[in-house]
UniProtKB/Swiss-Prot annotation:
This protein's record includes keyword Methyltransferase: no
Lineage of origin: Bacteria, Bacillati, Cyanobacteriota, Cyanophyceae, Synechococcales
Region (LID): 127-133
Name the record gives this protein: Adenylate kinase
Reaction catalyzed: AMP + ATP = 2 ADP
The family this protein is said to belong to: Belongs to the adenylate kinase family.
Job description of the protein: Catalyzes the reversible transfer of the terminal phosphate group between ATP and AMP. Plays an important role in cellular energy homeostasis and in adenine nucleotide metabolism.
Length: 186
């Protein structure tokens, strides 16, 4: 079984939902960079204090800090398998992450790209009822995603580890498709 995984996909594709299901089903550790950052800040670790200073200014935490936090978590207890969600977001981050993981002998084994058409994504995001989920904002987020993520798709495809998943259908169907693609269905 592939036990070092990364999820990619546009906003509304169901990455978080599918990551949670797969981790529960396979006993993987779900590494959400947002959750890891918040945990470091709450623990007031040196990395957390540095991240808090940046976050309190409304700025993005540097790639170096995020990579350090990911590395710390991986070396702690993620040897048995993990799924990384929410990072990387651009090609430089992907290349840095790949180097880091190779250095600790934990290279990514599969990158799951959940694909959906824009209209389905927009419908899903609008149904969440969040105040910032207007059609205009959602379309802009999709544009930004495509601009930043297209190079990641090519990068991981060139490494031979990209697996495309059709995200249409209900949660259980997509989960089954993912497990099947990873060879987890008998």
């Amino acid at each position: 079984m592939k036990s070092r995984l990364l999820f990619l996909g546009p906003p509304g594709a169901g990455k978080g939902t599918q990551a949670k299901l797969l981790c529960e089903n396979q006993g993987l550790i779900h590494l959400s960079t947002g959750d890891l950052l918040r945990a470091e800040v709450n623990a007031q670790s040196p990395l957390g204090k540095e991240a808090a200073l940046i976050m309190n200014k409304g700025e993005l935490v540097s790639d170096e800090i995020v990579l350090s936090i990911v590395q710390k978590r991986l070396s702690a207890d993620a040897k048995s398998g993990w799924l990384l969600d929410g990072f990387p977001r651009n090609l430089i981050q992907a290349q840095s992450l790949q180097q880091l993981l190779e250095n600790v002998s934990q290279p990514i084994q599969a990158v799951l790209l959940i694909e959906l058409d824009d209209e389905t994504l927009i419908k899903r995001l609008l149904s969440r009822g969040r105040s910032d989920d207007t059609q205009e904002v959602i379309r802009h987020r999709l544009e930004v995603y495509r601009e930043k993520t297209a190079p990641l798709v090519d990068f991981y495809q060139s490494l031979g580890i990209l697996v495309k998943i059709q995200g249409e259908g209900d949660v259980k169907d997509v989960a089954l498709t993912i497990r099947s693609a990873l060879g987890l269905v008998m």
